[in-house]
C-alpha cells in the first residue's frame, strides 16, 4: 500500500468511497457525496491524501478548516473514508498517521473529529493516533427522522503550537 497526495484524477474513486461511507449511515450526516466543486472547496489543498493498493485508490483522508476565524487557523477537522472492501486492513490508521504528519508540517496544532458513537472502528483509529474524547454533542442533528449524537474527539500536536 502507498499513501500519496491526492490528485484531481482520483476524485471519481474518492467520491465513490465517500458514498460508500454515507451509505453505512454511521459516517456523516451527508445524504449524497459532494460533487467536485463542493468537495474541492471543502478541504484544505495541502492536506489531502489517498491510500493506493495495486494502482487502485482504496481510501482517502483530508482536512477542512474548523472555523473561518483567524484565531483558529491552526485547527482543522479530519475526514477519513475507506473503501468497504478494504476495511480492517490498517488503511485508516496509515492514512490518519500520515495526515497528522502533514498537518503538523502545515502548522496545524489541533485536529478535531466528530464521530458517530456507533462507528467503533473510527473511534479506535483516532484513539490509537492520540485523539482524546472531549465530549458528546447530544442530538446534534437528525438522520432519517432520528436524533444522532456525535462523539467529539481532539488531538493536540506535540510539535506545533507548544
Where are the regions that the model predicts?
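Conserved GNAT acetyl-CoA-binding A-motif
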Residues: 103-115
Amino acid at each position: 500500500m502507498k499513501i500519496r497526495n491526492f490528485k484531481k484524477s482520483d476524485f471519481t474513486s474518492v467520491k465513490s468511497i465517500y458514498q460508500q461511507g454515507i451509505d453505512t449511515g454511521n459516517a456523516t450526516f451527508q445524504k449524497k457525496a459532494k460533487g467536485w466543486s463542493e468537495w474541492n472547496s471543502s478541504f484544505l489543498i495541502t492536506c489531502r491524501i489517498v491510500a493506493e493498493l495495486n494502482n487502485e485508490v482504496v481510501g482517502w483522508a483530508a482536512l477542512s478548516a474548523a472555523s473561518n476565524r483567524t484565531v483558529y487557523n491552526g485547527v482543522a477537522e479530519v475526514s477519513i473514508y475507506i473503501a468497504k472492501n478494504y476495511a480492517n486492513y490498517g488503511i485508516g490508521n496509515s492514512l490518519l498517521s500520515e495526515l497528522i504528519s502533514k498537518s503538523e508540517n502545515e502548522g496545524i496544532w489541533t485536529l478535531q473529529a466528530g464521530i458517530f458513537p456507533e462507528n467503533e472502528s473510527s473511534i479506535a483509529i483516532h484513539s490509537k493516533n492520540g485523539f482524546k474524547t472531549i465530549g458528546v454533542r447530544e442530538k446534534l442533528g437528525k438522520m432519517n427522522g432520528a436524533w444522532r449524537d456525535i462523539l467529539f474527539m481532539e488531538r493536540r500536536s506535540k510539535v506545533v503550537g507548544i
